[in-house]
Amino acid sequence: MKSLFFTEEHDLFRKSIKEFFAAEVHPHVDKWEKDSKVDRSVLKKMGEMGYFGLNVPEKYGGVDLDFMYFTTFYEEIGRTGAFGFGTVVVSHVVLAMNYIMKAGSEELKQKYLVPSVQGTKIGALALTEPFAGSDLKGMKTTAVREGDHYIVNGSKTFISNGHYGDYIVTALKTETGISLLVIDRESEGLTTSKLDKVGIRSSDTAEIAFDNVKVPVSHLLGQEGKGFGYMMESLQVERLAGAMTAIGGMEYALDLTLNYIAEREAFGRPINKFQVLRHKVAEMASDIAAWKIFLYHTSYRLGKESLLSRNVLCSN
């Protein structure tokens, strides 16, 4: 039966992603978790395959495909069950690259977006602070303009890709309000501390301190004081990517469950023969199917329109 949302090309793309993940991700997940780091070589391969530039214009090295390719990609990331790896990719593409693509100058796009699409530079987004969480109004990190530079002071915490990434899209307070700066991780005065975690260890999570970090004014994303608006627009894509990854993760968990209850025996037969478990599995599968249709519909509409706050918020 023909899909309402996907074409044959989308299906072929899904098949190629599955094959790539089976060859390049699944065999290495345990090692990455043990090492607390995703091998950069796989990220570079993903860049070479065009996976980081699905919705990026061709002039910046992307392939500029419709939004359903984006949806398919993040659903399949979730289905890998490699949630640390998935966090690295989502943080790079959706949290960091997306802001540069939407609000960056031509200079910033050439300097950061192009190598990000190629997988040779990996980005992070820094919003959360130690005493404010993600409460943007309570943000304490500041950027004071002095001539052709901003002087940045403050700290961020729980930043995905914050330790091993190459640049950090940072939200901070300027004289005119909340602004966004692209800051190189190797900048003088910037230090990162990797946090130890119980799970999802292959995704590096960091505390970041800014001590009189000097950032060129040219690294400002969009207009000074307009950062909140940029974040509200970009958060829609972030939430949708997170929801699609979660749906893929649910399918992964359901597949594991089906395999387990087919093998596990009790009272002389596989436990998948017990009606109470069959009902529960059917209920879970129905919930997943309903959420998928809702998210596919939201993705399809978001690809046609610029703002769908209500639908995207419901997806979370």
Give residue ranges: language-model regions.
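Long, acidic (Asp/Glu-rich), low-complexity accessory segments flanking structured domains
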Residues: 212-230
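Flexible, small-/acidic-enriched active-site or ligand-binding loops
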Residues: 138, 186-216
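Alpha-helical interface subdomain recognition
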Residues: 1-83, 90, 103-108, 115-120, ...
